[in-house]
């Protein structure tokens, strides 16, 4: 479970941070446009380097290796608890990345190729900005999202066979669902889960049509990842 006191302190500090950050690049906007379309105002969105998140850590059980996002990385020893630290944090229209994870472009070769992990991270955090900009629909506030970390050992975990109502999930789960959609669309656009996720998202945002085949080359974080059947 995440240290919510430390995370709350970070949120408070970021609220007073005056760093402007950068706008999404043209490639990033093109990529995010396939998910959020015009329901996200990219002109108001800023990506900022230097989120003070090193002191924020959380321990969680291993997640089942049934999702695309879990199967593109190496397995961990059975029963091992996972200790991690956030790579980024979204606050209103700004996304604060740790220095290790801040990049000048998260989609540098798009649409010809996709750096999958970087694109998934961007899509997850952009979904929090979408939640804020569409808060009349989502009911989102940063404090509500923060509370999820004190009530669940893993607020990002979702059931791949769960409800088809996107807004029925927690805010971090919604970001993770978008990550999973990016992963499945990139690697298995005709798979059953890809279609389910697409149909779920299409109810709340103007997600673009699914392609009939893979749209671009995909850079994976693990060379031994098995792509066949990854989103069935």
Predicted segments with their positions:
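Short, well-structured segments within or immediately adjacent to enzyme catalytic domains
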Residues: 55-56, 63-64, 74-92, 137
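A metal-dependent hydrolase signature that marks the N-terminal structural subdomain at the beginning
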Residues: 19-76, 98, 103-104, 202-232
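A generic secondary-structure signal for well-formed alpha-helical elements
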Residues: 36, 130-134, 182, 186
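N-terminal secretory signal peptides that target proteins for export/translocation
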Residues: 1-3
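Metalloprotease/metallohydrolase-associated module, dominated by Zn2+-dependent proteases
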Residues: 27, 33, 83, 90-92, ...
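Short pre-active-site segment immediately N-terminal to the catalytic Zn-binding motif
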Residues: 76-89, 99-123, 165-167
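Catalytic Zn2+-binding segment of zinc metalloproteases
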Residues: 126-143
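Bacterial N-terminal signal peptides
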Residues: 5-18
């Amino acid at each position: 479970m995440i240290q919510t006191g430390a995370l709350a302190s970070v949120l408070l500090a970021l609220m007073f941070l005056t760093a402007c950050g950068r706008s999404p690049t043209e490639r990033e906007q093109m990529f995010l446009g396939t998910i959020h379309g015009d329901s996200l105002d990219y002109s108001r969105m800023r990506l900022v380097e230097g989120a003070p998140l090193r002191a924020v850590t959380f321990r969680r059980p291993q997640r089942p290796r049934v999702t695309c996002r879990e199967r593109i990385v190496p397995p961990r020893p059975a029963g091992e608890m996972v200790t991690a630290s956030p790579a980024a944090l979204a606050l209103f229209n700004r996304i604060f990345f740790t220095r290790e994870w801040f990049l000048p472009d998260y989609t540098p070769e798009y649409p010809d190729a996709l750096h999958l992990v970087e694109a998934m991270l961007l899509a997850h955090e952009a979904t929090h900005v979408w939640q804020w900009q569409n808060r009349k629909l989502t009911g989102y506030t940063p404090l509500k999202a923060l509370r999820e970390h004190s009530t669940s050992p893993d607020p990002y975990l979702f059931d791949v066979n769960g409800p088809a109502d996107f807004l029925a999930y927690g805010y971090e789960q919604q970001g993770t669902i978008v990550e999973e959609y990016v992963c499945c669309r990139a690697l298995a656009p005709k798979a059953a889960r890809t279609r389910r996720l697409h149909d779920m998202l299409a109810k709340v945002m103007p997600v673009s049509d699914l392609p009939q085949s893979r749209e671009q080359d995909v850079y994976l974080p693990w060379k031994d990842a098995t792509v066949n059947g990854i989103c069935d």
